[in-house]
Amino acid sequence: MLSESIARLVDYGIRRGLTPACEKIYTTNLLLEVFGEDDYQEPETPLSEKPLDEILNSLLDEAVKRGIIEDSIVYRDLFDTKLMNCLLPRPAQVQQTFRERYALSPTAATEYFYQFSQDSDYIRRYRIARDVRWKVDSDYGEIDITINLSKPEKDPKAIAAARLAKSGSYPKCQLCAENEGYAGRVNHPARENHRIIPITVNNSPWGFQYSPYVYYNEHCIVFNQEHVPMKIERATFVKLFDFVKLFPHYFLGSNADLPIVGGSILSHDHFQGGHYTFAMEKAPIEIRFTIPGYEDVETGIVKWPLSVIRIRHRDEKRLIDLADHILTAWRGYTDEEAFVFAETDGTPHNTITPIARKRDGIFELDLALRNNITTEEHPLGVYHPHAQWHHIKKENIGLIEVMGLAVLPSRLKNEMELLKTCILEKKSPADYPELEKHIPWVEEFLPQYQTIINEDNITDILQKEIGRVFVHVLEDAGVFSCDAEGRKAFLRFVETL
């Protein structure tokens, strides 16, 4: 049984171009060693193809049976990553192939590396396929929604083990270059099948990789080779455009550098990008204006729920200068009437979420104005999802959400299935503790569908209403509202430029 499963995995590696055919015996022996097995029987007849997750599961079951690992998702993930690494080329070989493809075109290079990152099981395609995805029309264009199911839930034993495990300082975080080839531990994922492409950004060494969770097509991460904190400054714009010049078919953006409006990792300087067109990119300019000294730069307010200034020019240096000017002005800007305060008690509140791209030969930079002030009424943030929407989304509005993609918690899948049953069978959501938080929302939207809702359309209706909530969430994150008053306040800031 073990021999057959190993043979299948080696065949997979050869078919996918991960393992040269001449290394078949060598790779087989590496895998035998991982299992502590001395004996091997080559299958007598050719084996039929099986999906990678099936092959790995049979090997993992064997490892559990032999007492090599515990039967838990955490230990299984650590072990199958070790198995996959036996098939893979070393980092220098991956980098060499990337350079060869890049000589053909940047697109050829990223297509190769993205495919490699999936075939190596660094991106677990069979888990990504579980994510629930849909699109919703809105006043701002077609918004993307995803319920994230690809991050595995840890079982209680693994959680307990992680709590007892010594917190290591190597690698310092999950974005550090030291993750490449790292075997992992119960409280840190294995990255033996991870490969990084070195690139130069702002004359310093950075790394290029893909996100293992792929929230959108070719979702990449670009990170500083040094473990230094996030900071939005002039150099940020230089780095963004250095990358876009290397990979003109990709956008690249940064999370803001303050809590509440920033991402989940502020301790390591990094960006996120990819090969995908978000609703924000398609959104038109609503109000055009010019900034003294930058009359040659196309500038305007974007029709978008967050407060976004878009600047465009053929010369990215003009955009870097102007973006730095806007950032400096925004950092120090206060408008009490609009409830915008640059700082309170010495704590700064204003920052920017920037997104760079190249469109039709012209460089473009979107600057989303952010503010992280809190009040008694809104203790998590005034420009953050308000409490009435927390039943759907209460987490920070980071870069990905700013661009128009909702990443919603996995609990929503089961809650929506239960809610469907309640609505169709005319049961009360109040009878189910997990649905209590949704009751005000259901009471608000359900009456308009009461006569038409049925088994065929209920999924579409719930998805549409979840999408509407997310648009409200984005509007909450906008410093200047999208009505006439808000636009007047926005233009007051523009006049200071």
Predicted regions and their residues:
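Active-site microenvironments that recognize anionic phosphate/pyrophosphate groups
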Residues: 1-222, 226-229, 303-305, 319-323, ...
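Helical scaffold of the NTase/Pol beta-like nucleotidyltransferase catalytic core
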Residues: 192-197, 227-252
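Catalytic or ion-translocation cores adjacent to nucleophile or general acid/base/metal-coordination motifs
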Residues: 235, 244-267, 273-334
